[in-house]
Amino acid sequence: MSAKNLIRAAAFLMFACAVLHSFAWTRAFADFSPEVRQLAALLWFLLGIDWAVVAGLWVMGASQGVAARRLLLFSAVVPIAVAVGLILTIGPLFFPIYLQLGAAGLLLLGTFRLA
């Protein structure tokens, strides 16, 4: 698989994370107390948008190739930080951790293979 296609696959996986996250929107209301429900809903919404934007930036970075290498590498911080946060708060058995790490891994592999 070419480097650009690996980056596009990472973007697809990150966008899938955003879609799955937005489908679970109503769960945010059930899992939190009424005092913090508004804040939880806002954070839930912002994470979905964040991941969709990152996926879009990765697609644009793949089309630019080597010129976007530094920015692509820097943007890998987003899914890695999310995965680490989920491991620390929920535990390592939570499936979305591996979606985030998979997206970051594909991105890093594709970015390092850019010629």
Feature roles, as predicted:
Residues P34-A41, L93-A103:
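Non-cytosolic membrane-interface motifs at loop->transmembrane helix junctions
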Residues D31-L39, A55-A68, A83-L88:
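Short juxtamembrane and helix-loop transition motifs at transmembrane-helix boundaries
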Residues M1-K4, R113-A115:
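Positively charged n-region of N-terminal signal peptides that target proteins for export
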Residues S2-M14, L71-L72:
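Interfacial segments of alpha-helical transmembrane regions
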Residues S63-Y98, G110-A115:
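Membrane-helix boundary connector in multi-pass membrane proteins
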Residues A103-G110:
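Small-residue-rich segments of transmembrane alpha-helices in multi-pass membrane proteins
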Residues F12-W25, Q38-A62, F74-P79:
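Core segments of alpha-helical transmembrane spans in multipass integral membrane proteins
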Residues V19-A30, V84-P92:
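C-terminal ends of transmembrane alpha-helices
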